[in-house]
A protein has these predicted regions:
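Active/ligand-binding-proximal structured segments within catalytic/core domains
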Residues: 46-61
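Basic polyanion-binding and macromolecular-assembly surfaces
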Residues: 1-48, 65, 69-72, 81-385
Length: 385
């Protein structure tokens, strides 16, 4: 079984500089991406402003940190600082979290137990994944969230990309100290590229695997050594390689308490709601905070397999998502279940085709409805009332 949530949004964004890349002289350039767009009977290539999935993930995880701390959910020291190196620097673990370092570096601790220790330590690494390069082994966890690039919707492909002139001046300070060739000039001229567009991006969440280890295939260090208490219960492959014995365990036997898994699933959805409502991603917010307005969105909660929503590039993306889910139901039968949710601001996204799908006019209500169904199904899966 599994419970999944997939989201796509259309965001009207004006005058944003969320994702800068390398400067060109005194010009701070906006990230760009090359896309293929169908035009009549052919395809055309366009270069458009973009915001990377990494920038979105960073903002997403920052919000998760703040909510987790407020709710008493464990967060490691570096994630709390917004440094998402995910225990990827062993020297930092050794100095900042000695108890964790002892577990991760121990040859007597199995790989699943090492991963579980990290999950207990930090909800952000549980949800966002990590790669910890230890001396003898790499501990890897794939992210439970998947994030796309944020791109202009291709239905109209209307966007603006401008270079804005800026001056930073400290004329009184310069006059006070006097000016010479080797001293700073009284003003600094620079340019910032900003963009405006109806953007769209997609986020997928694997709710069932939050709080559950993923390293279920591992080896003991010696043929002659006794199996650990957990490995005695494991399903053994019976294959030996050198002095190693390969073993498999049931991943769900190594997981957090069910109520903690639900809390973290709720945290993940709530953090996404704050990100979408407020646009807390990228940089330049101190002087270039974007005019950010979510204008429509669709969510699909499914079980037991994931169905990714149709991206918000076209005005009938909600209807296409509904048709996709209906098709899966016809194909897979009673084993497959889904619920679809829609948000729509009619004034800001005119001409959107939602078909016969019911929609919420308030984005907060949209997220409440999604969370209610997702957590209901997750609790059913975990055997909670």
């Amino acid at each position: 079984m599994g419970v999944y949530a997939s989201f796509s949004f259309r965001i009207l964004t004006n005058a944003e500089a969320l994702n800068a890349v390398e400067p060109l002289g005194n010009i701070i350039r906006h990230r760009r991406a090359t896309i293929i767009v169908p035009k009549n009977d052919r395809h055309e290539v366009f270069t458009v402003p973009a915001v990377s999935g990494e920038a979105i993930r960073h903002g997403y995880q920052l919000i998760m940190v703040k909510l987790a701390k407020a709710r008493g959910i464990n967060v490691c020291k570096l994630c709390e600082l917004g440094e998402f190196v995910k225990h990827g620097v062993p020297v930092l673990i050794e100095n900042l979290e000695k108890d964790l370092h002892e577990v991760l570096s121990s040859k007597d601790t199995s790989l699943p137990d090492k991963e579980l220790k990290v999950l207990e330590t930090c909800a952000i690494e549980d949800v966002g994944g990590f790669l910890i390069p230890m001396e003898d082994i790499q501990i890897k966890r794939t992210s439970r969230i998947e994030v796309s690039y944020m791109l202009p919707a291709i239905d109209d492909l209307k966007f603006g990309l401008d270079t804005q002139f800026h001056v930073r001046s400290a004329s009184q300070s310069q006059q006070a100290i006097g000016r010479s060739r080797d001293q700073a000039q009284p003003q600094s001229i620079y340019y910032v590229e900003s963009a405006s567009a109806v953007y769209t991006f997609t986020i997928n969440i694997n709710l069932s695997e939050i709080g559950v280890v993923s390293n279920c295939l591992y080896s003991t260090t010696s043929e002659d050594s006794e199996s650990s208490p957990d490995s005695k219960k494991a399903e053994k492959s019976g294959k030996k390689s050198g002095n190693k014995r390969i073993e498999i365990i049931d991943c769900k036997s190594k997981s957090l308490a069910t109520d903690e898994r639900v809390r973290r699933a709720e945290l993940t959805i709530d953090a996404l709601a704050e990100l979408v409502k407020n646009g807390l991603i990228g940089g330049h917010h101190s002087s270039y905070s974007p005019h950010w307005q979510p204008i429509s969105g669709v969510a699909l909660v499914t079980r037991p397999i994931q169905t990714v929503v149709y991206p918000g590039h076209v005005r009938n993306y909600v209807q296409k998502t509904a048709n996709l889910a209906k098709g899966n139901k016809e194909l897979l039968g009673d084993m497959y279940n889904y619920e679809i949710f829609t948000y729509w601001d009619k004034k800001l996204d005119p001409g959107l085709d939602v078909g016969d799908v019911k929609y919420a006019e308030d984005i907060t209500q949209f997220f409440k409805d999604v969370k209610s169904k997702a957590l209901e199904w997750l609790k059913e899966e975990l055997g909670m009332k």
